[in-house]
Amino acid sequence: MEQTLSIIKPDSVGKAHIGEIVSIFEKAGLRIAAMKMVHLSVKEAEGFYAVHKERPFFQELVDFMISGPVVVMVLQGENAVARNRELMGATNPKEAAEGSIRALFGESIGVNAVHGSDSLENAAIEVSYFFAKTEIVNALA
């Protein structure tokens, strides 16, 4: 069974959309293997998004991700990475499929409700960035 990382970003946390977003994941057959709310430090946000360090939007992304608490979770299920990506929708909410999380709750490319791992390899890296192995349960057991 695959695992992937999902982050409910500060905009969605601030607008009390956590329950609605979690419900979308669960109704699609993804289970929560770990979840916590954190307020990222500058160092944590920069480390997590280090792959984008040279991109022009990097500082804006970091500033946004530290602007309020986020909910980080490990989603588990069949094809979890691809299913999560499909549920999230396109990065730009205006291009996201109707009914997708970003179409429902996103405002712009930068303020787009959620983050999700883009590959199995990155999912493993991202999950370990936020969670120790002992914090993750087998949600399908």
Curated annotation (Swiss-Prot):
Its cofactor is Mg(2+). Keywords: ATP-binding, Cytoplasm, Kinase, Magnesium, Metal-binding, Nucleotide metabolism, Nucleotide-binding, Phosphoprotein, Transferase. It catalyses: a 2'-deoxyribonucleoside 5'-diphosphate + ATP = a 2'-deoxyribonucleoside 5'-triphosphate + ADP; a ribonucleoside 5'-diphosphate + ATP = a ribonucleoside 5'-triphosphate + ADP. GO terms for biological process: CTP biosynthetic process; GTP biosynthetic process; UTP biosynthetic process. The active site is at H115 (pros-phosphohistidine intermediate). PROSITE patterns: NDPK, NDPK_LIKE. It comes from the Bacteria. Its main location: cytoplasm. One of its GO terms (cellular component) is cytoplasm. Its EC number is 2.7.4.6. ATP binds at K9, F57, R85, T91, R102, N112. NCBIfam families: PRK00668.1. Belongs to the NDK family. Homotetramer. This is Nucleoside diphosphate kinase. It comes from Chlamydia muridarum (strain MoPn / Nigg).
